[in-house]
Amino acid sequence: MGNLTSARPAGCKIVETLPATLPLALPTGSMLTYDCFDTLISQTQRELCIASYCCNLRSTPEGGHVLLRLLELARADVRVTIIVDEQSRDADATQLAGVPNLRYLKLDVGELPGGKPGSLLSSFWVSDKRRFYLGSASLTGGSISTIKSLGVYSECEPLARDLRRRFRDYERLCARRCVRCLSLSTRFHLRRHCENAFFSDAPESLIGSTRTFDADAVLAHVQAARSTIDMELLSLVPLVRDEDSVQYWPRMHDALVRAALERNVRVRLLVGLWHRSDVFSLAAVKGLHELGVGHADISVRVFAIPGAKGDAVNNTKLLVVDDEYVHVTSADMDGTHYARHAFVSFNCAERAFARALGALFERDWQSSFSSPLPRAPPPEPATLLPVN
């Protein structure tokens, strides 16, 4: 299967949350999310910036400890800024209120051009513009201990500064600054990497002239795939949904089909299954799975956490192409996520790191928590009717 911790491009480490029911069955050499967050807090000397959909750390003991560490850090004269979505519940707001050097801000993505409802889906930390975490673990106790998640920790200072630029734009949006007043700048993008890595963004209104739209980054590599596409996610929804309309969004779905049918690329999707699974996602991946006949090598499996309660789910968001490119994010392959929600993804084209994450995907794909979707039975051979 390979060494899960062998590759360190841009000072990268793989970060995971594995619920208590999984570690024995899913061996890992990855850094744990709890340890990653604790390390970031310990290393910060000047400022710590955190973007997350919500802040609900007290839901588990481990999360409660992280909250206490954040409060201690702020009281030690270190600036701590937490940005969450405008619509999120203020579960920890009372504990955060009135703490010196700590700001708790809310971002209304619906204020972006277009005026459509949206959410902040970003999940990242930036410490002193020198180190960062980005992944699917939000600022909740569940993400630290009960929800399977994946992220990347890096001490690459140029990348950390580039991610801090995104946070600065979020801060200004919280202050109701118009998008035209934002720099929306980046040093690295699809055509210019830093140690084989760069960030991509959504929605398009936060791209500016130099950033890479996240869907474009993903599609560029899926459409260039030569041998394998492995994708682990919570949902794949080929729709953009508004309150009063639904628009078909086939870009990702069609790119996967074309890769398998036209270029003989092996396509594997591992989809998290839970009580809130999107019915359109299940229908879409079943359709892809049924195409896996003849020369088309497409297969779909579902990953379910045994005895899962509440929001316990496989929230890993990972794409590995040809064991050469990886994409780690907090969003799903969902048209609405790309069109309406705000998030940042990590992209890396370093072969050894891609192989390490490919080994992690293989571990999950082959695990006892993964099961194949049943295929429809083949049709009966056609019978020629007599001609009268």
Swiss-Prot record:
Which Pfam family name is an example for this entry? PLDc
Q: Which Gene3D superfamilies match?
A: Endonuclease Chain A (3.30.870.10)
Identify the keywords attached in UniProt to this record, alphabetized: Host endoplasmic reticulum, Host membrane, Late protein, Lipoprotein, Membrane, Myristate, Viral envelope protein, Virion
Query: Quick one: a GO cellular component term?
Result: host cell endoplasmic reticulum membrane
Q: Which InterPro entries match?
A: Diverse_PLD-related, PLDc_3, PLipase_D/transphosphatidylase
Could you tell me which residues belong to the region Disordered?
369-388
One GO term in the molecular function aspect is:
catalytic activity
Which intervals hold domain PLD phosphodiesterase?
A: 310-337
Q: Which SUPFAM superfamilies match?
A: Phospholipase D/nuclease (SSF56024)
Q: Where in the cell is it found?
A: Virion membrane; Host endoplasmic reticulum membrane
* Topology term for the membrane: Lipid-anchor
Taxonomically, which superkingdom? Viruses
Q: Where is the lipid attached (N-myristoyl glycine)?
A: G2
What job does this protein perform? Envelope protein associated with the inner side of the enveloped virion (EV) membrane.
| Entry protein name | Envelope protein F13 homolog
**Which species does this protein come from?**
Molluscum contagiosum virus subtype 1
Mind giving the lineage of the organism this protein is from?
Answer: Viruses, Varidnaviria, Bamfordvirae, Nucleocytoviricota, Pokkesviricetes
